[in-house]
Structures are given as C-alpha cells and as structure tokens.
C-alpha cells in the first residue's frame, strides 16, 4: 500500500516492533529477508523454545545474514524472558552473522525504558548508513512454509512436501557462473538472471551439484518474467528480465 502511494526507497525499508511487535519483527523479517534493509526487534523473541532445540527457528535465523539485526531487551523483563534474547545473541555470534545486541541494565518490559535511554540514538546510528543490497552475490535462504518462494534471484519453483527447504546460491562474476544448491522437499528452482551480477553478452552457466551444467548461450528478455517478478514483490529493484527453470534431477 505505502509503496504504491509514496516515493519510497525500497533499499531503505526497515522493520521494527516492541514486545509482540518484536516477535513479529523477528518472524516476518526472517521469512522475507529480501524486503528489508534491516530488522530491529525490541523485547521480543523469534521462538519461546531454546533456539538450539528448535531446528525451524534456527534455520530461519540464517536468513538474518543480509539483515544484520539490531535488537534490545530489558535485563529484568518480567514478561518476555531476557534469556531468549541472550540465546539469539549467542546463536548469531556462533553463525558469524553481524548484529548488535543491547541489554538495558535493570530494565523491565516497559517501552518508556527504550525511549528514555540511549537506545534510540544507537538504533539511529545503526540504521543511518544501512541500505539493502538488492543484488547479492551470495544467497543463503531457508523456508519453513509455503508463505514465500525464496529470496532475491533464487526462488523455489516446486515443492514436493512439507518441511524446511534450504537454498544456497553464489554468483562468480568473473566466470559468469551461478552455483546453486537445495536441500529439503523441493524439486524445481527458478534462477532469475540479474544484469547487475552477470554479463548478458556472454554465455551464462548454472551449476548444480550432481547435475550437468545448464548453459544459457544468449539471454532473451522475457515480458512474462518481468511482469511476474514485479507482481511478486512490487519492488523495482527486484524486477528481472529473464529466468532459468532448473529441475533438480541427478545426471545419468
């Protein structure tokens, strides 16, 4: 709605919320990581379970790599245990994901504590220089449901069942090569070709483990792909002119 009515820079959209809004920020932001420049959950949690024993939540947390979260929590929060935030902080550190965690000393579950301390200035300093990279050379994406089809230029085209799907994609710009892999109940992928990453005047090769390479000798721009990619995101930075459908079959 807002993007249709206002001149919004889609590379500068942030998601934040407090308490239940903090829960929503974690869960929405990590499910749709290509929509935001960053997420800033406050006094919320991704899961009420221990992150180490919740494989779906841990898979989603990997989607934070391009979001580099900023989050805060009160030390004495009586509503949402601070232990959940501390475990997220530790998990992100273990995964090598850049983030900022600030704990309010003596703080409870009160919004005025957030506005009354130095958190707003810290949040502003974190957000000010941040911009989404709409054409990342590397994608690590996990989906735990059919609410979303992937991220950026790598999408799930066909699911074969329920369960967690993990996608990885890397563009080797000098070689004009895309390397993709998938785990979980998925049989087909769509790889969108992005001229910010690839030279459309040269042959493009898509490599998948255990399969023969897929070669695109000449990129043909396709109106259907342009329209479909616009409809799926309504984001001018995520519109693509061509795509390659990849059936994940083993070579003979």
Model region roles, listed by residue range:
Residues 1-20, 30-36:
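Gly/Ser-rich "nucleophile elbow"/oxyanion-hole loop immediately N-terminal to the catalytic nucleophile
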Residues 3-7, 30, 90-97, 128-132:
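Sec-exported extracytoplasmic/periplasmic mature domains
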Residues 7-9, 35, 65, 185, ...:
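Short loop/turn motifs at secondary-structure junctions
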Residues 12, 38, 67-70:
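Proline-centered loop/turn at the N-terminus of a beta-strand
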Residues 24-28:
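Hydrolases whose catalytic domains are alpha/beta-hydrolase-1, hotdog thioesterase
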Residues 43-128:
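The feature captures the conserved acid-bearing segment of alpha/beta-hydrolase catalytic domains
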Residues 94-252:
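Alpha/beta-hydrolase-fold serine-hydrolase catalytic core, especially in secreted/extracellular enzymes
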């Amino acid at each position: 709605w807002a993007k249709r009515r206002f001149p919004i820079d889609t590379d500068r959209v942030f998601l934040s919320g407090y308490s239940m809004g903090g829960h929503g920020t974690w869960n929405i932001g990590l499910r749709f990581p290509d929509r935001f420049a960053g997420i800033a959950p406050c006094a919320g949690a991704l899961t009420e379970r221990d992150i180490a024993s919740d494989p779906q939540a841990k898979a989603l947390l990997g989607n934070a790599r391009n979001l580099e979260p900023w989050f805060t929590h009160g030390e004495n929060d009586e509503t949402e245990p601070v232990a959940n935030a501390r475990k997220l902080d530790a998990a992100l550190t273990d995964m090598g994901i850049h983030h900022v965690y600030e704990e309010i000393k003596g703080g409870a579950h009160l919004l005025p504590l957030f506005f009354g301390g130095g958190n707003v200035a810290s949040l502003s300093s974190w957000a000010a220089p941040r911009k989404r990279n709409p054409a990342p050379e590397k994608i690590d994406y996990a989906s735990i449901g059919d609410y979303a089809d992937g991220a950026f230029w790598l999408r799930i085209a066909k699911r074969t069942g329920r369960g967690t799907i993990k996608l990885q994609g890397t563009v080797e710009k000098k070689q004009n090569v895309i390397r993709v892999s998938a785990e979980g109940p998925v049989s087909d992928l769509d790889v969108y070709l992005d001229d910010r990453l690839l030279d459309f005047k040269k042959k493009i090769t898509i490599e998948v483990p255990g399969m023969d390479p897929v070669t695109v000798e000449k990129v043909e721009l396709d109106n259907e792909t342009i329209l479909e990619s616009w409809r799926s995101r309504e984001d001018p930075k995520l519109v693509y002119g061509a795509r390659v459908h990849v059936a994940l079959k083993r070579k003979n």
